[in-house]
A protein has these predicted regions:
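Carbohydrate-interacting regions of secretory-pathway proteins
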Residues: 1-201
Length: 201
């Protein structure tokens, strides 16, 4: 598809950055794997407006996340976190925009692949899981404006895998960036449909 490119070559961690190299590896048929204590894996480049897609898999009680517009820093990087947590202890479940908009029930089973599609355009963040739009959030504070994509490995008990990671950078111009967004997020097209005329009694 036009404008999309893979962020991960499926073979090694070329271009990716981490402060905890022992936590991340490539396994299976081109999967990024996070294990061990909390750590983050940062994308080769930084982005402002974009759509990101990735398939993710978590173990039972696992906890992970995808941080958007993340700062390249040790510890928990500043940024918008897309939560990945199916049966873990955290009350904010898969699809939440962490600490901004909560999803309290996960429809994703442990050890099953699910597809995350997320977009950040200006101060608007969209999160879609397996084709269902869960979050369309306007951050009035515009808290984070540009940064890296950071995959989180949350804790020793968690095991997270990512595959088919791809990104579509979007223009800085908001109107241009929003053009055609409903092709990726079909629920947006539903919102645009005019209401059906009411029948007279």
């Amino acid at each position: 598809a036009a404008g999309w490119f893979g962020l991960f070559n499926g073979k090694d961690l070329s271009g990716w950055m981490t402060f905890d190299p022992g936590a991340w590896s490539v396994v299976g048929s081109g999967e990024l794997s996070g294990r061990g204590p909390r750590s983050y894996l940062f994308s080769p480049g930084s982005y402002r407006n974009f759509i990101l897609q990735a398939e993710t898999r978590l173990n039972a009680k696992g906890d992970s996340g995808i941080v958007l517009r993340a700062a390249l820093e040790t510890g928990a990087p500043k940024g918008y976190e897309v939560q990945l947590c199916n049966t873990g202890d955290d009350a904010q479940k898969t699809g939440s925009l962490y600490n901004f908009q909560k999803v309290t029930e996960s429809a994703i089973a442990d050890d099953q692949w699910s597809k995350q599609t997320v977009a950040v355009i200006g101060n608007r963040i969209l999160i879609q899981v397996n084709g269902k739009l869960l979050v369309d959030y306007p951050d009035k504070e515009s808290t984070y404006t540009e940064g890296y994509i950071a995959f989180q490995q949350h804790d020793q008990a968690s095991q997270v895998n990512f595959k088919n990671v791809r990104i579509k950078p979007l223009p800085d111009d908001i109107a241009a960036a929003l053009t055609g967004l409903e092709k990726v997020f079909p629920a947006l097209a539903e919102k645009k449909k005019p209401a059906a005329p009411s029948k007279p009694n």
